[in-house]
Amino acid sequence: QTITASVGVTYDENQLDTLINGLECMQADQQVEPVNAHPEYDGNSYVVKAGETGSKIDTENFKKVVKESIEGFKSEIDMTAEDCYVEPKYTIESEEVKKACDDMNKYLKASITYNFGSNTEVVDKDLISQWVTVDDNMAVTFNSDAVVKYVQQLESKYDTYQTKRTFTTGGGNSATVEGGDYGWIIDEAAEIAALEANIRNGETVTREANYSQTAASHDGADWGNTYVEV
C-alpha cells in the first residue's frame, strides 16, 4: 500500500504582504518605469529603437511568485525568469511600432527647394523629422502648425512690401523711402497649403513660393535696376 502525504506550509498572509511591501525593490524610488520600443530618427530615417524593461515590479505576480516559492521551499527567485517586472507595452517586434516608423518615413521622402533669386531654402527630412511625432499609442501626427510657422519665417525673410528702401538720387545723394504698395508678398494661405501637400505626398520639387504680389528682383534692390525719381 502506498501512502501519499502532502507537506503544508502555513503563514500569515497579511504579515507576508507587509514584509513584501517593505522590500527595497518594492519602493517607488528603486523602480524604473519600462520604456517602450519607439520610432527614432537616426539622421536618415526613422528606425525602431528598442525599449527597456526597467525595474518596475509587477506587484500581483511578484507576490504570487513569492508565495509559491515559500510553499515550494525555494530560497531564491529569479525575478526576470519569473516575469516579476512590468514589461513594455511595445517591443521591437510590435507591428504597431513598425507601422509607425513606416508612416513617419513617408513624410521624410519629401524635399522642397525654394528659389528666392540666388538664395535657396530647403525643407527636407532633417526639418520634416521635427514636424512628425508619435504618441504612446503609436499614433503618428504631422504638426501642421510647424508648417505655418515656417512659412511665416519665409515671409519675414523675403517679403519686401512696405519695407524701407534706400537708393541714390540723381544728384548723388542717398535717400530712404518707405510705405507704398510695391514689393514681394508671399501668399501665406496658399503657400501653407502647397507646402503641406508637398510633404504629405512625399514630393521632391524645386519651385518658387506662392505670391499674392511680386516685384522685379529678389537680389539686391527689389525694384531691379530701373526706377523713376519723383
Predicted features by range, described:
Residues Q1-V230:
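Surface-exposed, secretory/extracytoplasmic low-complexity segments enriched in Ser/Thr/Asn/Gly/Pro
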